[in-house]
């Protein structure tokens, strides 16, 4: 099939066979796994996944690709959901779900936050993303890439940077490097928040002006007495605080 990549869907099709094999090996699909692929494109990962799985689910928004897949793969092996991944309820497929995908780079962060809402149904996730986004996902405190995305994902997920992928592995070639990442939800949260919505608001406020100190960004939420009780220096910036520190602030305010 000759398919012209559609910019509005952020399409870049993976074509490098050696890299595809490396990704499949990292995912390590087992025959009985319940797996869903987001944005299968022209089947670069779909075909090798189907060779190892009894059945595969895919979520695809492009009607041309859906039509091609319907004529290319047997229905008893592949279930196609014609849907926007940002609106899709992944929990409707299974409570023990493995998620994979070459995510559209233009909506990758919203998809990641949407998947956080589906984490109770997910065993693990493997994604191809813009390298800069993966670096933010796995970033440690006090590093340049560390931010809101790092904190909110690392609160729920163990993150692992697996592989850097060059632009020439895709058609069309993106203007940036890509990377493959593994995200595994914690079965027991290492630092549970009493109020996760409050945690989200605190993290958003703290990073809204990342060059300002916590005393300024959390003004009206936490005073010097609160900082002292938590043992947190109010002169620090958000980028200096580990996820556990933000949870401590949220739990102090929720008490």
From Swiss-Prot:
It is found in: Cytoplasm. Its EC number is 2.1.1.182. One of its GO terms (molecular function) is RNA binding. SMART domains: rADc. It catalyses: adenosine(1518)/adenosine(1519) in 16S rRNA + 4 S-adenosyl-L-methionine = N(6)-dimethyladenosine(1518)/N(6)-dimethyladenosine(1519) in 16S rRNA + 4 S-adenosyl-L-homocysteine + 4 H(+). It is an enzyme of class 2 (transferase). The keyword Mitochondrion does not apply. S-adenosyl-L-methionine binds at residues 12, 14, 39, 60, 84, 102. Its main location: cytoplasm. Keywords: Cytoplasm, Methyltransferase, RNA-binding, rRNA processing, S-adenosyl-L-methionine, Transferase. It comes from the Bacteria. One of its GO terms (cellular component) is cytosol. Specifically dimethylates two adjacent adenosines (A1518 and A1519) in the loop of a conserved hairpin near the 3'-end of 16S rRNA in the 30S particle. May play a critical role in biogenesis of 30S subunits. Belongs to the class I-like SAM-binding methyltransferase superfamily. rRNA adenine N(6)-methyltransferase family. RsmA subfamily. NCBIfam families: ksgA. This is Ribosomal RNA small subunit methyltransferase A. The gene is rsmA.
